[in-house]
């Protein structure tokens, strides 16, 4: 959510900034609603004051034994008019809130202006793209040939965009989770946190998934209004909702492993084969809560921490700055890490690292006390994948395959697999 004061005082500036995203904000209509709100608030307060004065006068007249019925009728008329004004004011406030909740974040000035992913800017590359002397296979071809990855069985159990993994591939998948957690906790200093995988609507509103992106979520039946979490960013970030933190508590740096559940409502026809885009997947998430002045340095650190995982696994990747037309609605600035997939002969997203600035904090009422001014200020929130586990498995399978369809284990993972150094075709 954007700053209400900014929206009220300079809606045209907001419209200009959001246009960089391709988002049309009707500043004129918003300003008209704001003028109506102010007029109704002044009118309502005036009627309230007048009714209070008349009510007091009734009490004084009654003590003098005067006839108060005409005065009481006037007060009743004022009361009815006041209730009508309050109803109108509530309706205008609801309209303003609907607009406010629909607005995306203002992009940071350093974000490249562009229309879509074609306008994203490559920042750096790491690692050498492997040169194979044989026709490479995709991860799903490799997994099925190994007899350890079964999409047909998953489709029978549930439906499309699911997978069943067995044997060493299932073990490798689990090892990746532990490896990522160990690096982030032991070397990067994150605190591990375990959170619910089911969240309520208030949490989703706080991090920005509701009301705009409900179609991307799996909603549970029943009267609780619960949803399966699409990313642990949601429950982890909401741990500071409606809190006033001390400056000494900041920055807060959490790492969390969780399954994620997404409907992929807007992804019909995309990545229909394999594990690239699934309804259920595992992710290790990094979340920062910082002071406003520290958040952009934090974004660079968070991104580098995610990069370390790829470097330890010796997987070629690149870092891309998303343009204004491609960043997520709540983000002010985002870096994507894209790993090399030989079967597609291209880089694919494996992590998205974002600074949300105060966008989520304003929705969540997540604040801290500034020791220099003693003022209560909004924190900044950041999040990023460190990494998406399934896509990391995919990248290992494809980059570490040999001509026989065997998968060689990266050195960094061998201690997690009891010394296994190859997953062989039988």
Curated annotation (Swiss-Prot):
Identify the residues that bind L-serine.
231-233, 285, 385
Query: Which keywords fit this entry according to its UniProt record?
Result: Aminoacyl-tRNA synthetase, ATP-binding, Cytoplasm, Ligase, Nucleotide-binding, Protein biosynthesis
First-tier enzyme category under EC: ligase
What is a single molecular function from GO for this protein?
serine-tRNA ligase activity
Superkingdom of this entry's organism?
Bacteria
Q: What GO CC annotations are associated with the protein?
A: cytoplasm
The cross-references to CDD domains, in alphabetical order and at most eight, read:
SerRS_core (cd00770)
Record text on subunit structure and interactions:
Homodimer. The tRNA molecule binds across the dimer.
Protein family according to the UniProt entry: Belongs to the class-II aminoacyl-tRNA synthetase family. Type-1 seryl-tRNA synthetase subfamily.
Q: What does this protein do?
A: Catalyzes the attachment of serine to tRNA(Ser). Is also able to aminoacylate tRNA(Sec) with serine, to form the misacylated tRNA L-seryl-tRNA(Sec), which will be further converted into selenocysteinyl-tRNA(Sec).
The name this protein carries in UniProt is Serine--tRNA ligase
